[in-house]
Amino acid sequence: MARIKRGTATHARHKKVLKLAKGYRGRAKNCYRIALQRVEKALQYAYRDRRNRKRDFRGLWIIRINAAAREHGLTYGRFMHGLKLVGVDLNRKILAEMAVNHKDDFAKLIETVSSKLAENS
């Protein structure tokens, strides 16, 4: 019975890891054992930060909406409550986009919300 040699599989696996480690500093880019550790850690960071990015953007959108709403005399919380009362179903990403790039449309939205809030008070 012929003996099984696994050199090609090992070589392919090493090559895959070293390809992912391209651009790393020092031996992390060309020494397999070190590269494997760095690549695994990098993939952990990537996994974690894909989730953190969603949180970060939501926070950014809220900050932008709050700033734009306060320019018109409303707080973020009151503005969002007013939107719910009016029945406007826009997400924070779109509202932040409006607040930054479409100020006149956002002002109309604020006006609508303000009138509804005054009506309910």
UniProtKB/Swiss-Prot annotation:
GO terms for biological process: ribosomal large subunit assembly; translation. The keyword Ribonucleoprotein applies. GO terms for cellular component: ribonucleoprotein complex; ribosome. Signal peptide: none annotated. One of its GO terms (molecular function) is structural constituent of ribosome. The keyword RNA-binding applies. Keywords: Ribonucleoprotein, Ribosomal protein, RNA-binding, rRNA-binding. It comes from the Bacteria. Transmembrane segments: none annotated. Pfam families: Ribosomal_L20 (PF00453). Belongs to the bacterial ribosomal protein bL20 family. Binds directly to 23S ribosomal RNA and is necessary for the in vitro assembly process of the 50S ribosomal subunit. It is not involved in the protein synthesizing functions of that subunit. NCBIfam families: rplT_bact. This is Large ribosomal subunit protein bL20. It comes from Wolbachia pipientis subsp. Culex pipiens (strain wPip). The gene is rplT.
